[in-house]
């Protein structure tokens, strides 16, 4: 079975961390199938980074207080849980915060190694008076989902090391709805609209791409049971279909001069696809096909967004504007007379 039109996905940004994605047209019923799978994957399985444990100078446990600080350790930990970080490292990384009062301590005061970034520097952590001093060492790790503090407490943890709950997921909220959409005479196709909101550490489009990659990997396991099994085939994308149509055009549709057209036909070049498969050097080897004909062909192809096999990127037809002149007409007439002889 072949879907009449390949589904397309478009992004409608709401702001930097929120976008709506529209996927259509989908076969009837596939809107809910795809929407539910993507939503659950986005909320549970997108990799991210978070603080897993910390150590505060002079503090042995989370029920302590820090001299000169307005907040107790429990309040500081609650604030640190809101820290949005990203890490390019697979192994744990240590970030530091050292501050002397009087001042407000924010995430902007954190010193992180290369590859680790704090995305909400305005986050309030603590308030110190003139006698206050705060030194915190935090461990940042990569993971996914939610991990409670009990699981972050590893055997052999040093005294004073406080494990905390870690929320790795960079996705905050995902909703979706399915509407009916029309394809030609059928009105029962699905239109899936997904609303994705993320933390500043990841763009919504990157979260969607990550979820899609995860689902492809998992569904691939099922496909491996029988790679020759029949299923629904997705048609070519509109751009691929348009390109295929252009390549199938006969060279008559290029409206070339008589000389260029006859030379190409004599060489056995009948379609645009056969023409773009040739290089400029190949065409110059054709009898009576000179540089002027080359420029004409390149200009016609550039108007279609195509080029010869060895044409340099960014060929600008505006720099070589070809138009048939009286001399070209006379040259074609001489060519025709020669051919008739």
Curated annotation (Swiss-Prot):
- Molecular function as annotated in GO: DNA binding; DNA-directed RNA polymerase activity; protein dimerization activity
The EC number(s) given in the record are 2.7.7.6
Name the GO cellular-component terms.
Answer: cytoplasm; DNA-directed RNA polymerase complex
Q: Which UniProt keywords apply?
A: DNA-directed RNA polymerase, Nucleotidyltransferase, Transcription, Transferase
The superkingdom of the source organism is Bacteria
What general EC class does the enzyme of this chain belong to?
transferase
Q: Which reaction does it catalyse?
A: RNA(n) + a ribonucleoside 5'-triphosphate = RNA(n+1) + diphosphate
- In Pfam terms, one family for this protein is RNA_pol_A_bac
The yes or no answer to whether the keyword Transcription is present is yes
Chain residue ranges for the region called Alpha N-terminal domain (alpha-NTD): 1-226
The reply to whether Secreted figures as a keyword in the UniProt entry is no
Quaternary assembly: Homodimer. The RNAP catalytic core consists of 2 alpha, 1 beta, 1 beta' and 1 omega subunit. When a sigma factor is associated with the core the holoenzyme is formed, which can initiate transcription.
Query: Known NCBIfam families for this protein?
Result: PRK05182.1-2, PRK05182.1-4, PRK05182.2-5, rpoA
The family assignment reads: Belongs to the RNA polymerase alpha chain family.
What name goes with this protein? DNA-directed RNA polymerase subunit alpha
Tell me which species this is from: Acidothermus cellulolyticus (strain ATCC 43068 / DSM 8971 / 11B)
Which gene is this protein's source?
rpoA
């Amino acid at each position: 079975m072949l879907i009449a039109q390949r589904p397309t996905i478009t992004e409608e940004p709401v702001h930097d961390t929120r976008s709506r994605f529209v996927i259509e047209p989908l076969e009837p019923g596939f809107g809910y199938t795809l929407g539910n799978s993507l939503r659950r994957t986005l909320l549970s399985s997108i990799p991210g980074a978070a603080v897993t444990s910390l150590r505060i100078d002079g503090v042995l446990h989370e029920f302590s207080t820090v001299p000169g600080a307005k907040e107790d350790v429990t309040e500081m930990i609650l604030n640190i849980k809101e820290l949005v970080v990203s890490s390019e490292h697979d192994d744990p990384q240590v970030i530091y915060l050292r501050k002397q009062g009087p001042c407000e301590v924010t995430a902007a005061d954190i010193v992180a190694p290369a590859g680790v970034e704090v995305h909400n520097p305005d986050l309030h952590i603590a308030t110190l008076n003139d006698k206050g001093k705060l030194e915190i060492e935090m461990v940042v790790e990569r993971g996914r989902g939610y991990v409670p503090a009990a699981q972050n407490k590893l055997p052999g943890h040093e005294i004073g090391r406080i494990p905390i709950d870690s929320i790795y997921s960079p996705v905050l909220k995902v909703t979706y709805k399915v509407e009916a959409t029309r394809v030609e005479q059928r009105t029962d196709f699905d239109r899936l609209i997904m609303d994705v909101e993320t933390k500043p550490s990841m763009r919504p489009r990157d979260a969607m791409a990550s979820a899609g990659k995860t689902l492809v990997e998992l569904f691939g396991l099922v496909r491996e049971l029988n790679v020759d099994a029949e299923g629904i085939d997705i048609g070519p994308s509109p751009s691929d279909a348009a390109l295929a149509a252009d390549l199938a055009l006969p060279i008559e549709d290029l409206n070339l001069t008589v000389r260029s057209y006859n030379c190409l036909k004599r060489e056995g070049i009948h379609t645009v696809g056969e023409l773009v498969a040739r290089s400029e050097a190949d065409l110059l080897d054709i009898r009576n096909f000179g540089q002027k004909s080359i420029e004409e062909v390149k200009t016609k192809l550039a108007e279609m967004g195509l080029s010869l096999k060895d044409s340099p990127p960014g060929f600008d037809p505006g720099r070589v504007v070809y138009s048939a002149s009286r001399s070209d007409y006379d040259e074609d007439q001489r060519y025709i007379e020669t051919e008739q002889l």
